Design a protein with these regions (language model features):
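Surface-exposed helix-capping loop/turn segments at secondary-structure junctions
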Residues: 45-51, 112-121, 156-163
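Acidic/histidine-rich alpha-helical segments that form the ligand environment
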Residues: 42, 93-125, 132-143, 148
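Short, contiguous alpha-helical
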Residues: 29-33, 37-40, 50-87, 127-169
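Bacterial Sec-dependent N-terminal signal peptides
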Residues: 1-23
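Residues within well-ordered alpha-helical secondary structure of globular protein domains
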Residues: 45, 68-71, 103
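Short, solvent-exposed loop/beta-turn-alpha elements that line the ligand-binding surface or hinge
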Residues: 90
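Iron-associated oxidoreductase/ferritin-like identity signal
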Residues: 18-24, 93, 97-100, 156-169
Length: 169
């Protein structure tokens, strides 16, 4: 009986240790998944006709915001992966912008998924400078959140409830 209890305790302890073995990158992945889902939903939710909408003179259109997100996250994930991958962000209509956004999300998923706390300390390139992968991927999350904030403002101006506020009174 005591040996079974000891075995169960050891198994439970090792499972808890495994779950916490990559706390930095687990949190990073959680943050990335949250913002990428909001961005994709926001891109899909904005009507096609509003992709040319600009909040003011000198600002990007909604379509340009979506393709900017795709361009930057594609470049950052490529830098973290040690590649020089390019994505076609030249078209800002809804179909093209959402397509390239999905392409860069799929690509970034392949970069975030295998990263561990140890591999996150390996070097990659960000804007031509050597940086730990963690910094590059974390900057992507920061930038995505900043750009999602702009998407939210555009959606609110158009009377559309953004994904992160759906279901709230």
């Amino acid at each position: 009986m005591k040996s079974r209890l000891l075995l169960l305790t050891m198994l439970a302890g090792s499972a808890a240790l495994y779950a916490q073995s990559n706390p930095l990158t687990s949190a990073l992945k959680q943050n990335y998944n949250g913002v990428k889902n909001n961005i994709l939903k926001a891109a899909e939710k904005m009507p096609d006709a509003d992709y040319s909408f600009k909040a003011g003179e000198g600002s990007r259109s909604y379509g340009e915001i979506v393709t900017h997100i795709a361009q930057v996250q594609g470049a950052l994930c490529a830098g973290a992966k040690g590649e020089n991958k390019q994505f076609d962000v030249s078209k800002t209509d809804k179909a093209s912008a959402v397509a390239v956004l999905k392409e860069t999300i799929d690509y970034c998923d392949s970069v975030y998924e295998p990263v561990t706390d140890a591999s996150a300390m390996e070097m990659g390139k960000m804007f031509g400078r050597d940086q730990p992968k963690f910094n590059i991927l974390n900057f992507n999350v920061i930038h995505d959140n900043e750009m999602y904030g702009q998407m939210v403002a555009y959606m609110r101006i158009k009377g559309i409830v953004p994904p992160s506020s759906e279901g709230r009174p």
